[in-house]
C-alpha cells in the first residue's frame, strides 16, 4: 500500500533536480529488443490476478479462483499486494486503461490483445457501476485492521476473516465525494467511448452513470467523509477531478456545458505553483492529482494554443526543464519524481507525452521527437535499458524482481512472508507464482533498488502503478508493433506439496501403537480447502493371525483431536480390510475446511490416535510390519516427517500418498513430491513449530501479561470487588531480537476500549474462589497477533469476619512427592510441574522473579530457561518468547 498520504511540494522536488538533464542519447523504440506486445499481454495478466469476486471464464490465471463473493459489491480489482478495494484507484486506473484503448485500439488489436483488454476494462467498469448507489457511493470494501496484518491468498481470505472476526462479509463504506465520483465518471466515459459501437447497451449504462455521478460531484464540490480509506489514500483536491471528468463528459456527449464549467468554475480553482499565481505544471498525474491529464484533454478539446502551451510546460519540466524547474534525473536517465512509485509517475507521464505528440504536436517535429524519445526512454528503462540491465516488470527479460510485495502470488500458507523471494535466511523461499506484468515501485533517485518483499517502497505493485504504464504500452504497440506470446501464460506445476501427511510415533508398547499425525494444507494452485477430507493409516495384523487372534481383537481410539470442539471434529472408523491381513482406519473430518492455508495453527490439523489389542495379550503386537509405520520415528513433534504411506483423500479421490498396492494420485488431480523434515533434537520444543523443510521459523507475535494482581485478593461476604493495583502489559515480539512494549504495567480499567475485565464469575453473596479475567480487544488480537490474549487471577470470598487484609502469600512449588529436590528430568519452562509448558508457567515464573513465589527443586531447574543457572527476569523473557513462537527450543540464550 502506498504511504504517500499528503501533498508534497512539487517546487521543492523540482529544485532538487536542477543539476540533471534528459539524456542526450536515446534508444530508438523501433529498433528495440523488447516485445511491447508481450509486455501488454502480461500487464493484462496482472490485472486478472487482481480480480476479486467470481473468476470470469476468460481469466487466464490458473492459480486464481473465486474469492470474496459475499462483498457488498462484488468484482473490482484489489488495490495492490493486499485485498482491499478502493473505488478511487479502481476508477483512476480504469480511466487510464480506457484512454489507452481509445487512442491506440488499432495497435492493441494488432498485438492480439483487444478482446482481453476489453474484458479487463469492462470488469473494472462494471464494479464502478455497482459502487454507484444513487445517493452515495461505496468507496471502500475491506477491513484494514485485518487485511494489513494477515498475509495469505485471496481464495482463503474469508476463511481466516471468519475465524478471526466471526463475520462472513467484509465491511463496506459509503460517502458522497466529488473527487471519487468525478474519477468514476471519467472512467465510465472512457467505457462509453470504447464500447458504444460494439456493446451499445453496456455503453449506454456507463454513460448514464457517468452523467449522474458527475452531476452529484459537481453539486457537492467537496471531499467526502471517507475516513476508512484515509490511512491509505488521503484525498487533498477535487477541482482537478471535476476538470478531468468534465472533459471526458464533453468527449462522450458533445455538450458544450462541460467545457463551460471548466472555464468558469474549475480552471480558476486548479493548483498553482508554490508561492506563485502561475498554474501548476510540475508534479505528475496520479490518483490524487489528475490535473495534467485534464489540461491535456482541455487543450485537445478546445484547440486553444494557451492550453497547448500550458501542457508543454509540464513536458518541459519532465524533460529539459522550464522556468528554472526540472525533475530529478537518476544517473541512468530515469525522470524521478517521488520515492513511492517512481516508475508509476514516469510511465504515466510517458503516456501523456505519447498522446500529446499524436494530438497536439503533429505539426511540431522538434517537440514530437523530443517527447517521443522521452517516453521511449522511460518505458525502455523499465524493461532493462539501465546500467544494471534490470527489468522492473515482473516476468519480462532475464533479470527482474523476485521479491515483489504481493500476498496471493506468494502462496504463503503460514502467514509468514518476510523472506519470500529470497534464497537465504529463515523461511526463505520463492513466490509460488510469478506475478507476470506487474510494474514494481521502482528505484530510488540513484538507481538503487532493494529487492526485498518488506521494502515495499521499491517492491510494491498496484493497479494504479500499472495503469499509465499499460496505457503507454498501447501507444507503443501501435507505433512500434509487438506480438502476443501464443504460449503465455505457461502451465504452472506446484513448487511444493499442497496436501500431505506428516506423522511420528507418540508411544509404542507391547499392546499398542500411538501415532501423532498432521494433515497439512499448503495449497496455492489455487489456495483452497477440502470439505470432505480424510486420511488412511494402514497396518498389518499377520502376527496376530499367526498367534490365533483376529481383527476383532483390535481396537482404535482418538486421544487428541485439534478440532474436537469445532466443525472439523475428526471421527475414526473401525478397522477396514484393505487386502489379506492389511487393514486401515480412516480418519474423517466432519468438515475438512478447517485445515486451511491461512496461518500457523490452521495449515495443519493434529490428531493423536491409538491402535491396540487387550493388555492381557502378550508378545504378539509388532508395528514394524505396518505399511504406514514405515519410516516413522518416536519422539512426538520433534520426529515428525512427511510420509506418503498415510494416504489423503478428497471424498473418494486419492490426493496424497501411495496405497499399499502401489496406487498413486492421478497427476491430473494433484502433483506432489515427498518432502521430509530433518529431525531437530531439543530439550523442549514448541507445539506449533513445523515445516516441511529444514528451516527454523521465527514468528512475530504478541502476548498479554499480568504484572501485578490487585492489592486485595480476599473478601468478606458482601464486600464489593476492588481491583486497585491490577496492572497488565502488552508486548509485541518480532524477529528474534526485538520487542515493542505496547502497554506497560497499566490498569486495564483505564483502557475500556482495549481491555475487558470479566468479573462475571464473582459472587460476593457466598464464599468461594472466583476467577477474574482480563481480555484483549479483537483489534489488539489482530494488530499484535496475540498468542495470549487473556490473563486471569483468583480472588476468595470468605464467610467469616476477617480482621486484617490478606498479605501476599509466599509459596514454594515442590515436586509431586512434596519434596523440593531435583529429579534430574528437566522440562525447561514447566515451572508448575504439570508436564506441559504454557502461559501458566510464565505467570508463575514472573511471580517468582517478583519475589512472591519461591521455586525449588524441579521447578527451579525447569525455570532456568536461558541456561544461565540463575533464575531472573531474563528467564521470564525467554520463556515468553518461546510461548509466542519467537524461539523454538529451551533452554535458549537468545
What are the residue ranges of the model-derived segments?
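A surface/secretory-pathway sequence property marking extracellular, secreted
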Residues: 542-591
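Terminal connector regions
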Residues: 606-667
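Low-complexity, intrinsically disordered segments enriched in Ser/Thr together with acidic residues
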Residues: 585-619
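Aromatic (Trp/Tyr) and acidic
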Residues: 30-45, 49-100, 142-183, 187, ...
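Serine/threonine-rich, repeat-prone extracellular segments and beta-strand-based repeat modules
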Residues: 736-782, 793
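Short beta-strand elements of extracellular/lumenal beta-sandwich folds
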Residues: 510-531, 537-539
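Solvent-exposed, low-complexity, repeat-rich "mucin-like" stalks and linkers
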Residues: 700-739
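Cellulosome-associated attachment modules in secreted, modular CAZymes
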Residues: 19-25, 696, 796-894
Amino acid at each position: 500500500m502506498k504511504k504517500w498520504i499528503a501533498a508534497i511540494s512539487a517546487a521543492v522536488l523540482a529544485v532538487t533536480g536542477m543539476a540533471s538533464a534528459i539524456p542526450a542519447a536515446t534508444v530508438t523504440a523501433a529498433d528495440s529488443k523488447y516485445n511491447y506486445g508481450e509486455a501488454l499481454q502480461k500487464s493484462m495478466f496482472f490485472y486478472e490476478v487482481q480480480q476479486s469476486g467470481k473468476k470470469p471464464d476468460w481469466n487466464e490465471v490458473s492459480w486464481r479462483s473465486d474469492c470474496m463473493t459475499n462483498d457488498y459489491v462484488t468484482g473490482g480489482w484489489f488495490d495492490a499486494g493486499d485485498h482491499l478495494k478502493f473505488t478511487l484507484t479502481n476508477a483512476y486506473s480504469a480511466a487510464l486503461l480506457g484512454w489507452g484503448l481509445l487512442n491506440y485500439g488499432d495497435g492493441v488489436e494488432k498485438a492480439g490483445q483487444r478482446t482481453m483488454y476489453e474484458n479487463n476494462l469492462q470488469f473494472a467498469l462494471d464494479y464502478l457501476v455497482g459502487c454507484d448507489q444513487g445517493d452515495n457511493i461505496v468507496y471502500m470494501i475491506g477491513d484494514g485492521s485485518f487485511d494489513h496484518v494477515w498475509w495469505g491468498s485471496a481464495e482463503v481470505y474469508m476463511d481466516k476473516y471468519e475465524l478471526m472476526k466471526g463475520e462472513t462479509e467484509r465491511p463496506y463504506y459509503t460517502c458522497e465525494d466529488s473527487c471519487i465520483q468525478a474519477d468514476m465518471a471519467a472512467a465510465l466515459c472512457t467505457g462509453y467511448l470504447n464500447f458504444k459501437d460494439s456493446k451499445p447497451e453496456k455503453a449506454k449504462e456507463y454513460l448514464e452513470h457517468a452523467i449522474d455521478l458527475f452531476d452529484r460531484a459537481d453539486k457537492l464540490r467537496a471531499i467526502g467523509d471517507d475516513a476508512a480509506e484515509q490511512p491509505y489514500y488521503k484525498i487533498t483536491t477535487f477541482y482537478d477531478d471535476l476538470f478531468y471528468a468534465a472533459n471526458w463528459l464533453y468527449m462522450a456527449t458533445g455538450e458544450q456545458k462541460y467545457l463551460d464549467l471548466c472555464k468558469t468554475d474549475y480552471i480558476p480553482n486548479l493548483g498553482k505553483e508554490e508561492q506563485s499565481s502561475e498554474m501548476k505544471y510540475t508534479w505528475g498525474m496520479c490518483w490524487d492529482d489528475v490535473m495534467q491529464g485534464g489540461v491535456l484533454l482541455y487543450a485537445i478539446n478546445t484547440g486553444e494554443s494557451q492550453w497547448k502551451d500550458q501542457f508543454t510546460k509540464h513536458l518541459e519540466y519532465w524533460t529539459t526543464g522550464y522556468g528554472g524547474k526540472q525533475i530529478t534525473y537518476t544517473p541512468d536517465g530515469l525522470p524521478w519524481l517521488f520515492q513511492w512509485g517512481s516508475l508509476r509517475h514516469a510511465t504515466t507521464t510517458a503516456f501523456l507525452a505519447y498522446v500529446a505528440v499524436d494530438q497536439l504536436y503533429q505539426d511540431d517535429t522538434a517537440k514530437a521527437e523530443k517527447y517521443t524519445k522521452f517516453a521511449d526512454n522511460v518505458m525502455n528503462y523499465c524493461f532493462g535499458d539501465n546500467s544494471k540491465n534490470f527489468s522492473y516488470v515482473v516476468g519480462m527479460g532475464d533479470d527482474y524482481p523476485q521479491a515483489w510485495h504481493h500476498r496471493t502470488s506468494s502462496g504463503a500458507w503460514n502467514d509468514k512472508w518476510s523472506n519470500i523471494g529470497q534464497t537465504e535466511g529463515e523461511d526463505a523461499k520463492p513466490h509460488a507464482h510469478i506475478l507476470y506484468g506487474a510494474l514494481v515501485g521502482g528505484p530510488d533517485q540513484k538507481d538503487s533498488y532493494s529487492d526485498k518483499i518488506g521494502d515495499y517502497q521499491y517492491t510494491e505493485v498496484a493497479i494504479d502503478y500499472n495503469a499509465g504504464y499499460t496505457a503507454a504500452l498501447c501507444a507503443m504497440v501501435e507505433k512500434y508493433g509487438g506480438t502476443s506470446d501464443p504460449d503465455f501464460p505457461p502451465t504452472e506445476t506446484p513448487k511444493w506439496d499442497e496436501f500431505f501427511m506428516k506423522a511420528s510415533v507418540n508411544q509404542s508398547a507391547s499392546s499398542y501403537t500411538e501415532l501423532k499425525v498432521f494433515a497439512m494444507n499448503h495449497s496455492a494452485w489455487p489456495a483452497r480447502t477440502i470439505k470432505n477430507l480424510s486420511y488412511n493409516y494402514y497396518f498389518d495384523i499377520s502376527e496376530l493371525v499367526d498367534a490365533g487372534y483376529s481383527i476383532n481383537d483390535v481396537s482404535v481410539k482418538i486421544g487428541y483431536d485439534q478440532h474436537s470442539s469445532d466443525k472439523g471434529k475428526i471421527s475414526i472408523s473401525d478397522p477396514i480390510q484393505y487386502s489379506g491381513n492389511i487393514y486401515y482406519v480412516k480418519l474423517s473430518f466432519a468438515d475438512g475446511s478447517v485445515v486451511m492455508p491461512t496461518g500457523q495453527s490452521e495449515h495443519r490439523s493434529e490428531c493423536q490416535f491409538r491402535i491396540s489389542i487387550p493388555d492381557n495379550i502378550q508378545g504378539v503386537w509388532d508395528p514394524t510390519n505396518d505399511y504406514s509405520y514405515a519410516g516413522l520415528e518416536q519422539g512426538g513433534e520433534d520426529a515428525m516427517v512427511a510420509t506418503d504411506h498415510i494416504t489423503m483423500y478428497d471424498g473418494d479421490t486419492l490426493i496424497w500418498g501411495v496405497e499399499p498396492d502401489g496406487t498413486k494420485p492421478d497427476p491430473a488431480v494433484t502433483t506432489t513430491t515427498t518432502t521430509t523434515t530433518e529431525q531437530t533434537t531439543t530439550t523442549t520444543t514448541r507445539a506449533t513449530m513445523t515445516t516441511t523443510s529444514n528451516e527454523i521459523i521465527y514468528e512475530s507475535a504478541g502476548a498479554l501479561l499480568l504484572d501485578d494482581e490487585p492489592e486485595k485478593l480476599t473478601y468478606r461476604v458482601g464486600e464489593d470487588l476492588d481491583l486497585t493495583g491490577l496492572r497488565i502489559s502488552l508486548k509485541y515480539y518480532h524477529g528474534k531480537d526485538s520487542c515493542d512494549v505496547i502497554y506497560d504495567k497499566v490498569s486495564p480499567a483505564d483502557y475500556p476500549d482495549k481491555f475487558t475485565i470479566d468479573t462475571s464469575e464473582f459472587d460476593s453473596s457466598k464464599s468461594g474462589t472466583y476467577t477474574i479475567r482480563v481480555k484483549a480487544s479483537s483489534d489488539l488480537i489482530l494488530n499484535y497477533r496475540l498468542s495470549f490474549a487473556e490473563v486471569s487471577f483468583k480472588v476468595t470470598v470468605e464467610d467469616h469476619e476477617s480482621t486484617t487484609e490478606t498479605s501476599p502469600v509466599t509459596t514454594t512449588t515442590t515436586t509431586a512427592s512434596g519434596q523440593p529436590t531435583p529429579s534430574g528430568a528437566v522440562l525447561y519452562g514447566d515451572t508448575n510441574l504439570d508436564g506441559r509448558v504454557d502461559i501458566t508457567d510464565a505467570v508463575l515464573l514472573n511471580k517468582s522473579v517478583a519475589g512472591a513465589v519461591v521455586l525449588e527443586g524441579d521447578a527451579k531447574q525447569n525455570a532456568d530457561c536461558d541456561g544461565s543457572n540463575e533464575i531472573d527476569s531474563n528467564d521470564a523473557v525467554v520463556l515468553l518468547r518461546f510461548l509466542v513462537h519467537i524461539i523454538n527450543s529451551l533452554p535458549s540464550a537468545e
